[in-house]
Amino acid sequence: MKPFLCFDLTNDKKNSVPNGEEFIAVKPSFASSQSLEDSKSDANEKLEQSKLPKPLRILQTVCGFAGFIALVGFLRSTATLSEAYQNAPFIFWIIAVCLPVWFVLLMLGLYRKKKVLSTEESIHALESLEGRVDAIYSELGVPENSRDADILTFFYKTKGDKIKICSKGAQIAPYLNPIYKVFADFENLYIVELGGKYVIPLSSIKGIRTVKKHIRIAKWNKEAVFNKGIYQQYKMNTDQYGTIHCRYYHIMEFELGGEAWEMYIPCYELPLFERLTGVKAQ
């Protein structure tokens, strides 16, 4: 089966086109796409201006890492304060210098970000981008009652009939979870991103199966906390990199264009897709 919305690097390590583009029924106009890119460029410029200069950001990272490592080492030590200083005085110097530098740079960064992003130019750039995004979704026919949903994607290579998930660049988790607009009618499931609207006939869906396998996904996109409220039942946790650990996931199987496809769904999105498709997971 072919993984939907995932990236096949078997024959092209630089491939950036996801599987399933042939199922895009509607794309935004060239003018809309160009306006979006212009707005993205303006917004990204303002966001970049809101950051500290790169050398200071590097210094902040180095000081923070070194300071906290030294602090953890000191706290775990069973030696007395005087013994610890005699054995490793440099640890005290690292803590005394690095942590204050890290904290000062953190505060400066927050101040700079707030100052730059509160200017009229920055506000206009960000509002313009939001308006362009809304305009494209409207052009693609996304209704107001559509829902935001994470869908799992990944880079992979094939060997025979087997799929091997791989990383690309400085990727911190094997599974990515971009946000799509999703909705359905009596005939189709619609999956929409700014590049176009995918259409999957409900009649093509063969089932949803549960895969009881631990996975790590890139980040948490929801406003609600991942381990509270409606999400507490999934018993997810996180790590020092901010990735989310899931105990299982789901695969929606469908046949389209003469091929068998699989769409990977994180555990916490299953109720939404069951409701939209009318198919219960097995």
PLM segments and residue spans:
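Anionic N-terminal interaction surfaces
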Residues: 2-14, 18-53, 102-186
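Generic L/I/V-rich hydrophobic alpha-helical segments across diverse proteins
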Residues: 43, 56, 63-66, 70, ...
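N-terminal signal sequences
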Residues: 66-80
